[in-house]
Amino acid sequence: AQMDIFEQYFYDLNQFRRVPGNDTVHADMVDMLEEKISMFEFSREIPVIGDTATLSDIGDFYRLSSIVDPETNVSYESISRKEITLFQNSPLANPTARRPVYTMDLPNGRIRLFGRVPDDILVNYIGMPRRVNWTYVVVSGAKALYNANAPDLWHFQLHPSEETELVLKILTLAGFTLKDPNLLQIAAGEDAKNTQQEKQ
């Protein structure tokens, strides 16, 4: 349920960027979605070996925002792998230390740098919410007792405004699991009503 809501942020952001926004501080949908996504924005320095850096060490990696050379504070431009040959063969577009570029191979998370290859790069990215883990201990009578002090305790990470949506998603999933058509119908109806209200 948490991942469904999280991924919907990006689809909604894409949709709302297509329509004119407004200047109202607390009512612009693009601003609200960017605020929700900002909870998951992180930066991390990773080593470069040869001309390649790998994102596989970033366990919660979801989407790449930008790459920066930490020594010069210059941002790398993202280009496709098919464009790199065109860039390298063009005197005006050839990557340089002042205008470096990178290509990304998503399946294996490899980033290849062109123009300038530092020892490390600063990766600005959007991370995934961690999997919820409500810890417990088994007490006498084989009963589970919530353990708030466990080091692996992890709650939902969504924006507080998503509480209703999260409950409805969980109810929908519970309706499927319990095979309760009434519960499923109520949750689906509320979800549709909320979605319609957000789109207006």
Please tell me what each predicted stretch does:
Residues 1-200:
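Glycine-enriched, solvent-exposed interface loops adjoining structured elements
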